[in-house]
Amino acid sequence: MSTFDAAPVALIVHAHPEPQSFNTAQMATAAQALRDAGYRVDVLDLYSDAWAPVLGREEFAPVEGYFKPQAEQQRAVEEGTLDAAVEAQLDRLLAADLLVLSFPLWWFSLPAILKGWVDRVFVMGAVFGGDHGLFGDAALAGKRAMLLFTTGGPGESFRPGGAIGSMDDLLFHIHRGMLEFVGYQVLDPVITYGPARMTDQERAAALDTVRESVALVAAGPRPAVD
């Protein structure tokens, strides 16, 4: 097996509409840190790719009567009729040893385009349910995932007793309800607080911190190679 084949794969799913944003610069910094550590990095830019986030009945074979999205996902997996765009994304997801969700924190959660990616690509019957279980028995067990994001507010707002409250509490629905649910080991998030309020020098220092934080992630345990 070649060194290239043996390299772990990181999939970065990026969701920011502005290519010149600090958030996008943060994603690029993280991607380079992973490459420097020997990862093959696959970057999926949802806005650039004009990803359609809505999970609807039109992407499935005709359904008579009541439409249940997850049941139709599982049927599409079993019958080999998944929407081509979804199947391509699913293949990239399953090939990755590390998933990085890169985004600005909007309304204390994921931007709609990224939540829609999860809705459509975390396919029932392919990553959980059907022949797979949940959590430790789901299809992505043994793989790692992390959040890489920016906030509008300062760090002190996201602490226990702060104006917003504990960041751990805020992220529970993503960490537990999305990532751990399909089997991932969830790593500590990499967060830049309030970059819009920083000077250029402070933003440069923040990117250095991101680089160092992601390098530590990359240096952590990696999946065994057959």
Model-derived regions, located:
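Short, histidine-centered active-site or binding-site loop motifs used for metal coordination
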Residues: H14-H16, G152, I191-P195
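Structured loop/turn residues at beta-strand edges in well-structured enzyme cores
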Residues: L94, L140, Y184-Q185
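Glycine-rich phosphate/pyrophosphate-binding loop and the adjoining helix
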Residues: T3-F4, S157-D226
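Short, glycine-/small-residue-rich phosphate/pyrophosphate-handling segment
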Residues: V127-F181
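Hydrophobic/aromatic beta-strand patches that form the interior of the parallel beta-sheet core
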Residues: L11-V13, D42-L44, M146-L148, L187-V190
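Pocket-edge positions in alpha/beta enzyme catalytic cores
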Residues: E78-T81, D137, M198, E202
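N-terminal beta1-alpha1-beta2 submodule of the flavodoxin-like/Rossmannoid cofactor-binding fold
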Residues: S2-V127, A205-D226
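Flexible domain-boundary/linker segments
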Residues: M27, E58, G116, L134, ...
